[in-house]
Design a protein with these regions (language model features):
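Glycine-rich flexible loops
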Residues: 29-241
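Compositionally biased, low-complexity flexible segments
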Residues: 1-23
């Protein structure tokens, strides 16, 4: 059945996610590696990501943004405003990935949209992005801004990050200072991520929240949940120290 039939057959509270696809997220890459899909499929998967975050309490107010790539030129992305946990098709737009950074803002594109589009421009393997505001992500991003990173070491949940096969060793999540000029922020993040330790499928904006991604909506969800859990563990461990 198509996306419309799937919507009719499930409750509003049940997010839809496509099944995981074969293959791994790899760098460097010279050809597109995201799963090919239609615009309605990308819109449906975007809605699923947004509703999941809403159910977890990660998008208070009208916070958060979620997107799924359609092809090399376009991505479905939640529009500015509106409760992301209750979003439907009317709250998702199709954005031009290659839009001129110096040009006018695309209609209904949120202030955080440029960060999504910059990630898609930088890496053709990225097929979906989730931006949310888990409490631990917001608190720890401020606390660890001076260090520029949060290190996770010895946690079994590290293995939920694609490419990590053991709890031994460490992985890092970058932390960047916030900037209301999100086009400028996107370029600054882009430059820093070029040399960042892999595997890494996310970053934090200080006092704001987390961006997590993957080659499809399933993997983006997995990384969002994994990083949120790891951040909860670090916050609790620091509280007890």
């Amino acid at each position: 059945p198509g996306p419309a039939a799937l919507r009719r057959g499930r409750s509003r509270a049940t997010p839809f996610f496509p099944p995981p696809r074969a293959g791994l997220y790899r760098r460097p890459i010279t050809t597109p590696a995201f799963p090919a899909q239609t615009e309605p499929q990308a819109v449906e998967a975007t809605i699923g990501l947004a509703r999941l975050a809403g159910a977890r309490g990660w998008v208070p107010g009208t916070a958060g943004n979620f997107s799924v790539r359609i092809d090399l030129a376009r991505a479905a992305i939640t529009a500015s405003g509106g409760q992301k946990g209750e979003v439907d098709e009317s709250g998702v737009i199709v954005a031009d990935i290659a839009a001129n950074l110096d040009g006018p803002v695309q209609p209904r594109l949120s202030a955080e949209g440029p960060l999504h589009l910059q990630l898609y421009r930088d890496d053709p393997a990225i097929g979906a992005i989730a931006h949310a505001h888990p409490l631990s992500a917001v608190v720890l991003s401020r606390r660890h801004l001076a260090a520029g990173r949060i290190v996770f070491e010895g946690w079994e949940m590290q293995k939920a990050v694609t490419g990590v096969t053991t709890h031994e060793g460490s992985i890092e999540l970058p932390v960047f200072a916030n900037d209301q000029d999100t086009k400028r922020l996107g370029l600054r993040v882009s430059e820093a991520m070029k040399s960042w330790k892999r595997p890494c499928f996310g970053y934090l904006i200080a006092g704001h929240g987390i961006y997590a991604w993957g080659r499809d909506a399933f993997e983006a969800r997995k990384h969002l949940e994994a990083y949120a859990h790891l951040l909860d563990l670090v916050l609790e461990e620091e509280r007890r120290a």
